[in-house]
Amino acid sequence: MADQTASAEVATEKMDTAEAPAAAPAASAAAPAEAESNENTTVPSNVLSANGGQQTGNQSAPRNTSTVPTRQYLDSTVVPILLQGLGALAKDRPENPIEFLANFLLREKDRYNAENQNPAGQQ
């Protein structure tokens, strides 16, 4: 009985330490989602927009950014300010890093919004 317990523990360890393929399932799952989002560009009336349901004067901008690849969208919108914020965070090393980063983002958002007026695909 001790041999069975030991072999069961070894089998459990092997299962726990086995690496799962990270890129293949995510890529295959993301491809159909992107295809579906490109086919249907209208948003149902019961779905709130990213701006909290507020209507903006330029309705074409959200549609343009939805067709831009995720990496390009993030690189052109939030990565620059996040890199600056993380640099300041590493330099200052405050006691409350999340609050520090949140305050940095709120304090500097207008400067980065002015720099990113053009959507990613229109440069």
Swiss-Prot record:
Biased composition (Low complexity): 18-35
Subcellular location field: Nucleus
Domain of life: Eukaryota
Span list, region Disordered: 1-73
Alphabetical UniProt keywords: Nucleus
Record-level GO BP terms: dosage compensation by hypoactivation of X chromosome; locomotion; nematode male tail tip morphogenesis; regulation of multicellular organism growth; transdifferentiation
Compositional bias of kind Polar residues: 38-73
Observed effect of gene inactivation: RNAi-mediated knockdown suppresses the growth delay and elevated body fat index of the TOR complex 2 mutant rict-1. Results in disruption of the invariant transdifferentiation of the Y rectal cell to the PDA motor neuron.
Principal cellular location given in the protein's record: nucleus
NADP listed as a keyword: no
Annotated GO CC locations: nucleus
Family membership noted in the UniProt record: Belongs to the dpy-30 family.
Task of the protein: Essential for dosage compensation. Required for the sex-specific association of the dosage compensation complex proteins dpy-27 and dpy-26 with the hermaphrodite X chromosomes. Plays a role in developmental rate and body fat regulation downstream of the TOR complex 2. Required for the robust transdifferentiation of the Y rectal cell to the PDA motor neuron during larval development.
Quaternary data: Component of the SET2 complex (also known as the SET1/COMPASS complex), which contains at least set-2, swd-2.1, cfp-1, rbbp-5, wdr-5.1, dpy-30 and ash-2. Within the complex, interacts with cfp-1 and wdr-5.1. Interacts with jmjd-3.1.
Protein name: Dosage compensation protein dpy-30
Species of provenance: Caenorhabditis elegans
